[in-house]
Amino acid sequence: MAATTPAQDVGVEIYLGPVWPAPSNSTPLALNLSLALREDAPGNLTGDLSEHQQYVIALFLSCLYTIFLFPIGFVGNILILVVNISFREKMTIPDLYFINLAAADLILVADSLIEVFNLDEQYYDIAVLCTFMSLFLQINMYSSVFFLTWMSFDRYLALAKAMRCGLFRTKHHARLSCGLIWMASVSATLVPFTAVHLRHTEEACFCFADVREVQWLEVTLGFIVPFAIIGLCYSLIVRALIRAHRHRGLRPRRQKALRMIFAVVLVFFICWLPENVFISVHLLQWAQPGDTPCKQSFRHAYPLTGHIVNLAAFSNSCLSPLIYSFLGETFRDKLRLYVAQKTSLPALNRFCHATLKAVIPDSTEQSDVKFSSAV
């Protein structure tokens, strides 16, 4: 009969993972509870997988993203910019906001090629590269969510306060709003970066993405507060829609613009929710006093989970052009007209029109009606 160790006799399992610090006055029961919480933490989704299995899964997901989503996001956002700029005289106020949203998404899609094959999260060991990618990611995130928040507020003004705000809802004020939103997005990223960089300037492995204060700001300013405002706007919009339906009904054009903005907001929420939950779980866990950001990096602890939530966030920038193409009838007509102008050969012209007709459904309204000034 084989000899057993004392640990085996009492059924004790030895925990080899990272050890959490225990308070000086902690009891054995409290220490065991903290270890149990660590093992059952929500972020620990891949504890039963080997490093090789996690690498294979991450590589497979990265290939799927690169083959299917990246071309849609890259080409789609460029088309939104090129087509709308080509017909700038027919550009509406919602189109102007969507152009800026497409520019922000295009930045992230281009940056995603670096991040998408960061399979073992080793890019975060390079301080300059980690900080560079984090800055681009945050600027895109802030600009996207700020534009969506402002677009929701603009829809509320167009539906509920049309008479009072008609003089202020002009293209000039829309361009000014876009400029202010970009300034706010850059400031919300660079001001915290400057502050924490001065404090951690002597740390060789400093990474902007791993600073807890920056992560709290990202979750609060980039997710919780904007979506609270968006939720309030849409609750007021629903009330305005009920009133409009009772009295005179709502113009079809306003309904379509509202439906498209709501779809973009919903996709943004679904794609960015895992990233913010992942960061929040890390922030709510205990941190050892005096630890540097390198030692607190949650992306090193859960590389596969971090990779999955990053891919989900990048997917938002790839799906927005699809929503804009299928729900934006004005853009579909502009795209057909743009293709007709750029394809001089009759055979190529017919092929492009047939392809567009097969991929993008026909509009139900005439083009001259859709190109009229928007609300």
Swiss-Prot record:
Gene Ontology BP terms: adenylate cyclase-activating G protein-coupled receptor signaling pathway; apoptotic chromosome condensation; cell differentiation; cellular response to estradiol stimulus; cellular response to glucose stimulus; cellular response to mineralocorticoid stimulus; cellular response to peptide hormone stimulus; cellular response to tumor necrosis factor
InterPro entries listed in its UniProt record: GPCR_Rhodpsn (IPR000276), GPCR_Rhodpsn_7TM (IPR017452), GPER1-like (IPR047143)
Matches recorded under SUPFAM superfamilies: Family A G protein-coupled receptor-like (SSF81321)
Residue spans, topological domain Cytoplasmic: 85-96, 154-175, 237-259, 328-375
PTM text: Ubiquitinated; ubiquitination occurs at the plasma membrane and leads to proteasome-mediated degradation. Glycosylated.
Function: G-protein coupled estrogen receptor that binds to 17-beta-estradiol (E2) with high affinity, leading to rapid and transient activation of numerous intracellular signaling pathways. Stimulates cAMP production, calcium mobilization and tyrosine kinase Src inducing the release of heparin-bound epidermal growth factor (HB-EGF) and subsequent transactivation of the epidermal growth factor receptor (EGFR), activating downstream signaling pathways such as PI3K/Akt and ERK/MAPK.
Protein name per Swiss-Prot or TrEMBL: G-protein coupled estrogen receptor 1
Species assigned in the record: Rattus norvegicus
Originating gene: Gper1
